[in-house]
Amino acid sequence: MKLALLGYGKMGQGIAALATAKGHTITAQINSKNTLQQQLEQALQADVWLEFSTPDTALNHIRTAIKHQKPIVVGTTGWYAHLNELRQEVVKFNATVFYARNFSLGVHLFFKLNQSLAKAMQNHPPVVRLDPPWRHG
């Protein structure tokens, strides 16, 4: 698969190493010195864009992906105030945007643990805790 990496910090570099080890090709590596506008031609050769930059930059990257109908996976947080307007653009351009509010392994493990715990506890009676009111004086 051909990938464009939009944001080449720790996460972008880690993805690049993993992707190339699995036989994928990186068509563009976007960072503060090599912008998407400068490498747009290379980025458009990718099958999918992976976005791990900054909130302001991510918004521009997402809009560019939508405009060019490039599927984009967004790991950057902090741009959600624009989510509703981006949804309208996705519909207008028939684009694909996948985002997650947190790509942290620890957070995903926590959610999985909670799901497992909820499943294990579903056949047990509910737990109720009653605290007596505090009396001062």
What are these regions, as identified by a protein language model?
Residues 2-15:
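Glycine-rich adenosine-cofactor-binding loop
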Residues 26, 72-73, 96-97:
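Hydrophobic beta-strand scaffold residues
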Residues 63, 76-100, 105-117:
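Rossmann-fold NAD(P)-binding glycine/threonine-rich loop
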Residues 109-137:
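Conserved anion/nucleotide-ligand pocket segment
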